[in-house]
Amino acid sequence: MALLEIIHYPSKILRTISKEVVSFDAKFHQQLDDMHETMIASEGIGLAAIQVGLPLRMLLINLPREDGVQHKEDCLEIINPKFIETKGSIMFKEGCLSVPGFYEEVERFEKVKIEYQNRFAKVKVLEASELLAVAIQHEIDHLNGVLFVDKLSILKRKKFEKELKELNKNPKNKS
């Protein structure tokens, strides 16, 4: 396995609309494994392939258990996802591995139902609510070239741009 480089905002790569996965071969499985290793090493709970430069409709979500530990067997590998149903509304504070150090409240659907394929191309259906629903929406947005900062109000977006400018002026402040 290998750690992959996470692409950061404002890279244009993050605006790429990802293509359907058609080959579920050994190379594809290795990409999923490398993505998982990268996500865990970066202390993330989700990662879309485009965030590591792969323009493919695949994402991972690995929520920690009550003890705060992320177990690989809990990792959702979601390939070629499609929304079937969405319900309700929830405000949730989000962050992103591609936008490090910035967290802001974003409005999302409270519940989602998706159809997707697993690593073996088997079609599955998943119903999710709260944090899992938010994470799914966040990562699917990445597959469509959308970042959570795009969903901010004008005021919050200006705050984000100002913080980003300050961070870029003083790179030693980066964590």
Curated annotation (Swiss-Prot):
Keyword Cell division: no
Domain of life: Bacteria
Assigned keywords, A-Z: Hydrolase, Iron, Metal-binding, Protein biosynthesis
Residues annotated as the enzyme's active site: E139
Cofactor note: Binds 1 Fe(2+) ion.
GO-annotated biological processes: co-translational protein modification; translation
Pfam families: Pep_deformylase
Cysteines paired by S-S bonds: none
UniProt-listed InterPro entries: Peptide_deformylase, Peptide_deformylase_sf
Function: Removes the formyl group from the N-terminal Met of newly synthesized proteins. Requires at least a dipeptide for an efficient rate of reaction. N-terminal L-methionine is a prerequisite for activity but the enzyme has broad specificity at other positions.
Name under which the protein is recorded: Peptide deformylase
